[in-house]
Amino acid sequence: MAGTHAVTVDVLDRDGKAPQTANAEYVLFRSLDGAASEYGQLDNGHVTGRLAPGEYVVETGVHTPKPSGGKSFTLVYVSRFVLDKDRTVVLDARKGRPMSIGVDRPDARLTGGEGGGGYARVVQTIGGQTTTTASIFLDGQPAYITPSGPAPGLSLLLQGRLTKDGAATGSPYIYNVAGSVSDQDIIPAEPALRVRTAELATVNTRYRRQGRPACAGTHAGAHWPGGGYTTGFYVGIGSLPATRTEYFSPGADWDTDTVLGADCRLEEAGVTGTSELFPSAGTYDRERTTGPLGAGADFNTLLNDGTVQFWVPMFSSWSAASGLAPYDRVTGRTTLQTADGKVIATSDQPGYGDFTLPEPGRGSGEAAYKVTTDAYRQAPWSDLATRQHIDWTFSATRPSGDWTGLPLLTVLYRTRLDDDNRAPTTTQHIALSPRTNQDEPAPTIRRLTLQISYDDGTTWEGAPVSYTQHGWEATVRNPSGSNGKYVSLRAYAEDTAGRTVDQTLVHAYGLKP
């Protein structure tokens, strides 16, 4: 074929043999100028074809059977292959070096759970952009990679989650480590990530019970350059309440979540998550599975055809957001209305719905709307947030572009609670945080009030709210003799943009005897 060159590829496994097709299925040629990748289907380690002249990354994955059973995996990686004439390339897995992740704690091992607790990603500059070119789960089978480079932007990134003896649950500590194995634009001859505990953020983490026996687990995954998805590995915390020392590589963005269920099978559960960055080594404190829970910062959008994508995480805490409906053991509904009460549309999920605004009249500007949501939760792992009722008001008009954000107000709470999410029957300070869409600046609040109930919302009394150097704060004195009772909260907020929220949260937290 004119304008192309013949390419012959021969692959060898770690025993120096041509692998069976099932053990090495394809070879990838990725043009360094960013053009489309070309795949070649291997036939027992061999393929021939033709490619345009140029410079390519060449890679293949090779499984080698072990005499004792199982297989090893080798990523054979060539960071720069010049195709300027007919050529043959031999991809030899015997050149692979073992990848490993470790810390300076002798009993710390990669977890043996799903995915194996370790992950490797290769990134390289392709077409002027940092690009993920290969990724591998370190799942317990021996894993190797061939040294390569130097090449612009080339890096082998390793991430691991390590526990005591690799325990999948119940370890008193969890290491979350991530980083490049070299700073020289190469895949080195020793592709290992070695981390000292003193170099990490030490995060003392408290997991609270929510009024009922419960079990929890967590995922953590680092953000990588080069695009692609974040890979998080699971570790079980065990029965609650519990405290754990969790170590994190500082300076990296981590996606973390907590899964809370009635037992450690977690077949039904509530999930909250957040993105965290610990800027430097040192000691930090954080809380998980802590109330009050309620509507968090939204993800609402308005499309130019008038579609409102109403997406509010309904069981968020001060420091972590829940997912979106549907939720386990939760029922409810959401309704969009005009300002005069005419129902536009209704969904059968709390905090969630795709609605269409009415066609605007000629010359009309923004119109006023109201969204109401109700959520009812009967979760065997939690007595918190058993009922929510929220009214939002806002004004909107169809955007001239494809879409625009539709940020609404919410108020989240933080207060000192014990390991069962209970407050003392004494003076109590409650921090209030008015929030809106996570990509929007903080709202400027014109008015904020709080009411409190000790009988599940049958009666309410006002609580004084003030703005201090630390933000909005309310002070209440909980009544004595409230054993087994719960505190419910009702907040009203209005900002300078004219948006309002009136939100009722039944069972925000419990009271101590």
Residue ranges of each PLM-predicted region?
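Low-complexity, acidic Ser/Thr/Pro-rich "mucin-like" tracts of secreted and single-pass surface proteins
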Residues: 1-513
